[in-house]
Amino acid sequence: MGLFNKKFSIEVMPKTAQKVRDFSEILPSKTLVYIAHLEDTDISDMKQTCIRLIDEDMIPMPHIPARILRNSSELEEWVSQYADVGVKRCLLLAGNNKTPKGSLHSSIQLLETGFFEKYGYEYINVAGHPEGNPDIDKSSKLTETLTALKIKNEYSKTTSIKLGITTQFCFDLEPVKNWLRILENEKINL
């Protein structure tokens, strides 16, 4: 494990996690493991993956994509099921679907339900897009993306839950450095 003495996170899907014999044999204790929730993934598979990761001394961070949820009742069901097995963190996303399955279409809507406070979550991450996101910002500017982060930043001031930003990996450092300067100038402190 000498190579892995720095903090890092990884991402798995329930199906690929099944191929790993024991996460504690390949990852340092308390590694943050994001669990991608694709549209065809059943919540029971997500929950079982969380249980397994906790049992193997990892920290599960399930994705909760707004656009695959039918309604806020289903959201509460997922949030409570995760909490029941010891999940204290999650990553909220709008999701890749162009058309929402129900009335929820943004991570802001998920935050505003109050379910995460109700079920004792401690950390919530939201998506960041240093290189932009064409689904959000139709131009090359980050206007809509930054507006969403400002709303989430304001929300973070009203809750005891710690909010953070998760980004996908990037191949070019310059857009990341530029994005961090923009966040600092806009006083976005997630």
List each language-model region with its residue ranges:
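Active-site beta->alpha loop and helix N-cap motifs at the rims of alpha/beta catalytic domains
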Residues: 1-147, 154
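Short hydrophobic/aromatic-enriched beta-strand-loop microsegments
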Residues: 33, 189-190
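Short helix-capping segments at alpha-helix termini
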Residues: 56, 117-119, 158-160, 184-189
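Hydrophobic, aromatic-enriched interface-forming segments
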Residues: 139-186
